[in-house]
Amino acid sequence: MGIQRSVTRTVGARRRGPIPCLSHFRWRRTVRPARRYPQCCGGLLPDSETLLQRWASRFHVSARNPVALLSHVGEDCAGAVQFVRSERLAAVLSGESDRQEPLSTHEIAQRLQRVRVDQAAARRLDDVGQFSLAGAQAKIALLQRDDGGWEFPAGRIPTTHILKPPSGDYDGFIENEVFCLHLARHVGMSAAFAEMICVEDAQAISVRRYDRIRTAAGWQRAAAV
């Protein structure tokens, strides 16, 4: 895979237009071989060797090649960057691949229960869109509609929230994280909005993504700066 477009767009900042994803890479309209990208791209992937190995086996790539993995799961990453395979690039740029797949309450509850014991269960092979979330805790990324419903987005449409169920290794982490984020906001610090949600018999923390903004054209990805 070559990286044909590796840019972010800073929304609402002084500098507008394309900027390099990495400060030491100049902006060029050329294809760069994936092998030339440093291991820092691995920071966009989950912190789970087991999960990365399973993805590598599923997509027939090396678990040590972050760009190869992101080419399959990186259409929705942190910030404004998207990793899009060359055969899908035209459809993504034109909006042809834009989709929103509604999820029922029961489906979300099942996903939250499954991902507690198996991080790879966050997505199925037939799901629209693909996301990659950094960190060690199991989580899923979804788009929340204005009516409170949830959807899987694809193409140019980004996820807006991250849902994390409780983990056996972190007792009470939902209450703790919600409290800490609310406390930070109360004392004037910049912090993401979070709340505890119950979906049937499944609990999770719902965190509104700080790298997504609402515009007249809908939800947009924003550079995490």
Please report, for each region that a protein language model flagged, where it lies by residue:
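Phosphate/dinucleotide-binding and metal-coordinating scaffold of catalytic cores
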Residues: 1-225
